Amino acid sequence: EIALPGKRHLISDLEIRGEDTFRQSCGKDAHLLLLPNHSTHSDPEVMSEVTRRLGIRPSFMAAYDVFARGRVQAWIMQRTGAFSVDREGSDRKSMKCATNVLVEGRYPLIVFPEGNVYFCNDQVAPFAEGSSYIAMSAQKKLGMNNPVYVVPVSMKFTYLEDVRDHLRSSIRKIARRFETELDAEAEFGRELSRISTTAVSYTHLRAH
């Protein structure tokens, strides 16, 4: 059973594809760098569940502001293999720590290369430079006889029921706040773009 119940994540099921290929390609003692996309705030918990099912214990690189959200959360994260990184600057200490984790090979290293949550299921944002730097630094230390395996991980979330009516209801309320209406006959994506533009213009005019 999935270990992500509750109102925070709202995830009822998890399907893993490519497990056999992953195990055959990487082996037990491989130096693994897992690079998942970052489409929701539940991604770290999902990756924890995935690695639990695969029987591996990972180490996470996480943004420092996640640790600042609370002492209890920071305490738990540190004791489950997570360490912080400053996304805004050159965090040499974190880069060194990540490289060492990869070189030692005791735990797979998980890095979200997009660097932030983008709420895009089917589109990946440009990667930050950190993940490639970590991989190449580790490979340089290990030498060519001990390869670093960089494993892309694609997470896709789907609704179990049709949520379009709920979404239209929410957008209709937002549209009215900015003195416009949702056109039910128009293509929804274009309407969403139009209402977003209207909201920005409305806010800009009210600010002046």
Where are the language model's segments positioned?
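Glycine-rich anion/phosphate-binding loops
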Residues: 90-93
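Histidine-anchored nucleotide/phosphate-binding helix
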Residues: 45-52, 135-138
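Basic/hydrophobic alpha-helical interface regions
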Residues: 5-19, 44, 52-59, 95-96, ...
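Membrane-anchoring hydrophobic helices of lipid-metabolizing enzymes
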Residues: 1-48, 71-74, 78-82
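Membrane-associated lipid acylation/remodeling enzymes share a hydrophobic transmembrane-juxtamembrane segment
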Residues: 103-164, 191, 195
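Acidic, His- and aromatic-enriched active-site or binding-groove loops in soluble protein domains
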Residues: 173-184
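Conserved small/polar residues in nucleotide/adenosyl-binding loops
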Residues: 203-208
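Short internal beta-strands
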Residues: 60-64
